[in-house]
Regions:
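Short beta-strand segments at enzyme active-site cores
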Residues: 3-8
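Active-site-adjacent betaalpha module
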Residues: 10-165
Length: 165
């Protein structure tokens, strides 16, 4: 899945969250000055070049860095999914109001676990199943605990976690 990472004025401390950068160690984030990512042609050119019309977005500051590009991309005909539990606002209310605003504009709210499940789709897809299971075991909360229990009952070795998820 093509992924675009962005930062805001990196030289002033706008670095990407380390855990996220660890997942994409070879990718240099687009260092932008625009508050609305969608106004930065360095970002939109990458999106247009990909040919994709569905966007899955997450951001720190839901009410600004997520809502602004999501709403603008919707206006340009993109189908936008906003990963609500991988995003956050300055307050719970700010996050909730921003999600409502995006939904009113046509965005589809989704959780990271739902994205993961939709992309995996079938556990028979063995090329990705172990990686997905590792992520669920490490970050899946009750679902991860249930998977660990299932693996234990079946006397199955859990996939090795590579970290950085």
């Amino acid at each position: 899945v093509p992924t675009i990472l962005t930062t805001v004025i990196e030289e002033r401390g706008g670095y990407l969250i380390k855990g996220l950068q660890d997942v994409f160690p070879d990718q240099k984030p687009v260092n932008r000055t625009f508050i609305n990512t969608w106004e930065d042609s360095n970002v939109t050119d990458i999106v247009k070049k990909s040919g994709r019309k569905q966007l899955v977005l997450a951001a720190l500051y839901t009410e600004i860095c997520l809502a602004m590009p999501a709403i603008q991309a919707l206006g340009e005909g993109y189908e936008v999914f906003v990963v609500t539990d991988a995003s956050g606002g300055v307050t719970a209310e700010a996050h909730d109001m921003a999600v409502r605003r995006m939904v009113q504009a046509g965005a589809v709210p989704i959780t990271w676990m739902a994205v993961l499940g939709e992309w995996q789709s079938d556990w028979a897809r063995t090329e990705t199943a172990n990686g997905i299971a590792s992520v669920v075991l490490e970050h899946g909360g009750a679902s991860g605990a249930a998977l660990a229990w299932e693996l234990q009952l079946l006397a199955t070795t859990p996939p090795e976690t590579t970290g950085g998820h």
